[in-house]
Amino acid sequence: MTLETTRRFTQRLHRRYAGYTLGVVAFVIALAAAERSGWPRHWIGGSFLIATVLVYAGIGLFSRTTDEAEYYVAGRRVPAMYNGMATAADWMSAASFLGTAGVLYLQGFGGLAYIIGWTGGYCLVAMLLAPYLRRFGQFTIPDFLGARYGGVLPRLIGVAAAVTVSFVYVVVQVYGVGLITSHLTGFSFEIGIFVGLGGVLVCSFLGGMRAVTWTQVAQYIVLILAYMVPVVWMNLSQTGSWTPLLTYGHQLRVVVQREGELLADPAERQVQSIWAQRAEEAQRKLVDVPAAMVDDAQRLAREREALRADDAPLARIQQIERAIRRQPRTEADARALYERDLALAQQQSQPLAGVSRQTEPFVRPGDRGSDDSAQTSARRNFLALVFCLMMGTAAMPHVLTRYYTTASVADARRSVGWSLAFIVLLYLCAPALAVMVKYQVFTELVGTSFGSLPEWLRRWSRLDAGLAWVQDVNGDGVLQFGELRLASDMLVLAAPEMGGLPLVVTYLVAAGGLAAALSTADGLLLTISNALSHDLYYRIVNPRASAVRRVMFSKLMVLVTAVGAAWVASLRIAGILPFVTAAFSLAAAAFFPALVAGVFWRRANRAGATVGMLVGLAVCAGYMVVGLPAVRLWLGWAPDPVRWFDIEPVSAGVFGVPAGVVALVLVSLLTPAPEPKHLEMVDRLRRPEPVRATD
């Protein structure tokens, strides 16, 4: 494209997306007017879902293509700012949109590891990888590994790692799609998954990277508006200020004060004591599960007969009968139930129900900071998590592929800057939102009588007891903080209702979360399908396949992968961020050493890269798997999990990356130097002219 053509293309994009933004604002205002006129909530939620998905589908349909360059890299003509916006949407997954504020609510200072790690990772992308990958100028990350190191093995390992990492991550996005769609429409979680899945497929299936790019720009506009509006509005209602980032210190001071009051509250301590007794009871049941099953059945039967004898209300009798029907029928089911009861009771018996104090650094949930060893362990895990997220961000295939789409190397570097700016805009708001939600819970919810609990809490409890849950543990009829459990995944979606904001804002947030999940799912599905169609099918299985045939095969892989991810997500994974962290650890261990060495170390060779990737993956995945109690039980090992330096399994990349680096360096030095064509490629990567694949 000539300079004049590029300028006109960019101006046309400015006009179109400015009009689109005005249209989004007008649509929200129209639905706000409809709410005031009496529209039912499911009409408003359905309108948000239908309108946004139709817009994304329209962009995908308009951008459909079978051209190879357009399908894989959007024709390499995406302006830096718009690629930055698309990258931010690709990045702002369900985990970022839904989980970041939630984890800051639950973990306080410890949750900042996610923000530091993710934003720091983009600095590594800008300095170490993005410009050089754009200069390389092919389609995928396995493409780079195959061209730089030669042979089949580096490319094949790259394909396997890209598919594994991206599939773990896309399952989380589909889970988020199901959660948000069910919130918008009232559908069940499983139906919500497959309804939302249509919005994912229509973009990535029809137009590949071209459709995904322009859809992601539109999705970023929706998600950033959806995140910032409730933050500003809640702060206005709580402090009277329009500038939340400058004034939410007021709410933070109140939160810190209330935490101290709750820790000293006799009613809270009574609730903790009752939970501790329940934990001991669950432990006793686990000692002899069959006997515990008999005892539970007899106890419930006695309670039912006593209620009937006392002519108790029918609702109370029916409640006991439902409890009898829900009793586990097998020993395995009973053991799983007692283990869940034990985990819940142990967490709720901790101070503040296991929620960390908001401003206290390096303290595990429930700990008051008096144990030096606990603080040391928390500090190690904080730094390990930051390390894994930074390295994983710099090695995530669906992120790096975006920098193939710019018009030049300079645009690729500028694009990283734009990406970081658009991402930071949301990440600056997340800590403020977490504090505002906790302020609302402490000042408006805790201390409320159970008969006056807000409708939003009842509705979320009905949707999924794992997301929101209350129980009058001490029987005083007043909600204590230890009798409340809110999952991190639902806090952002429920925040507008907590703050008493209009219903249209609640559904705007849900639409933003849907945009975040759809945008990342699109990018991940495309990464998986391209790895399978381009790197496996074309480069290894059938090198004579035509471009049209490869594109069609990629579309088929999009469909198959989406259905598989939907099935796994329908199993209702618990918590978003642990799965995301695991994906980043795997990406860091698999790709980061080989990619950076491929650019900056001429002596790195095929054998070194192959062994380095395999060793890094093996150490990382092995540490994760062996840390799982179920795996240890299956292997007949002691139930106590393995913890090197007390590092959590999800941060296994802190061991996998160094292991991969050591293996890559040693094997490269002990085996013959790379072939001249691969050395020449390294030299060309460091010079301005474009690079062509050499294998």
Q: Where on the chain are the PLM-derived regions?
A:
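Membrane-embedded helix-loop-helix hairpins and adjacent transmembrane boundary segments
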Residues: 1-695
